[in-house]
């Protein structure tokens, strides 16, 4: 079994105005909507229907796993998130294994460290500093039901520490179906559907749940050249529409060049453009976005 190892680096918000997550009504834990993959983040976060990159499927769409050419995919990534906004340093891990052509499993995790701030007591005296943090764990499964149809589900646990003694947690799930016709992957489902976050002082808040449809197609020119095209559309249940369009050019599966655009509108994630590149050799890849 050939296991593809990906050691990846991702620096988000390098192009245009993607300066972090926008406030959106009473949505809690917006970090659950962040794209953790340096491959898809370079494509405007498009690629939910693509089976070419599956390391971070537990954050995205596990229904793609049975259709992937990879038997295994493992990724580590670092994100310098929102360098001009509310900064955070994100460390992400994803691992996926496919067993035969029928079933695949995926796991992942993310840890975020926010910007340290000074703590002041009720009398105005300094009490030291505090560093907010976010944590997320995932597990998922993808199963091919018939030749051209697969189903997938992810389960997430997320926690957030905003201040000393102030922390929250939530559980959620993603459910997707994927159908392949004439080489085109078409997927639809829901993401981050789950529990609300309750606060003693301000009531209950929803996590960033959305309905999603996406498509992906790979164009091949001989054995040396290929282009992956991806289009995603999200409707957030608390309001707001988002869409992503991205492309990847690959030369002999050794060198990769990527670009994309994400339209955020009034949704949680602002609009941004992104670019990226990657190299791969003997199962080890380095990707930057």
Task: Describe these PLM feature segments.
Residues 22-289:
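Subset of outer-membrane beta-barrel
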Residues 1-31, 35-37:
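Cleavable N-terminal export/targeting peptides
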């Amino acid at each position: 079994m050939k296991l593809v190892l990906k050691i990846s680096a991702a620096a988000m918000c390098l192009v245009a105005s993607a300066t972090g997550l926008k406030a959106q009504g009473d949505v809690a834990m917006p970090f659950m909507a962040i794209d953790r993959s340096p491959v898809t983040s370079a494509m405007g976060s498009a690629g939910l229907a693509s089976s070419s990159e599956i390391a971070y499927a537990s954050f995205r769409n596990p229904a793609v796993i049975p259709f992937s050419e990879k038997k295994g995919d493992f990724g580590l990534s670092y994100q310098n998130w929102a360098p001009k906004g509310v900064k955070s340093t994100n460390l992400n891990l994803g691992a996926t294994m496919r067993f035969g052509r029928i079933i695949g499993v995926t796991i992942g995790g993310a840890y975020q460290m926010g910007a340290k701030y000074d703590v002041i007591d009720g009398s105005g005296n300094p009490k030291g500093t505090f560093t907010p943090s976010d944590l997320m764990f995932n597990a998922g499964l993808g199963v091919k039901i018939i030749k051209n149809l697969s189903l997938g589900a992810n389960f997430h646990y997320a926690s957030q520490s905003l201040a000393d003694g102030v922390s929250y947690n939530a559980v959620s799930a993603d459910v997707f179906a994927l159908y392949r016709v004439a080489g085109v992957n078409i997927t639809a489902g829901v993401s981050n559907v789950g529990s609300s976050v309750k606060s003693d002082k301000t009531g209950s808040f929803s996590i960033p749940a959305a309905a999603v449809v996406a498509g992906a197609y790979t164009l091949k020119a001989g054995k040396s050249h290929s282009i992956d095209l991806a289009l995603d559309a999200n409707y957030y249940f608390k309001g707001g529409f988002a869409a992503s369009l991205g492309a990847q050019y690959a030369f002999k599966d050794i060198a990769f060049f990527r670009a994309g655009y994400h339209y955020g509108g009034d949704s949680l994630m602002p609009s941004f453009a992104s670019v990226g590149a990657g190299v791969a050799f003997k199962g080890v890849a380095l990707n930057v976005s």
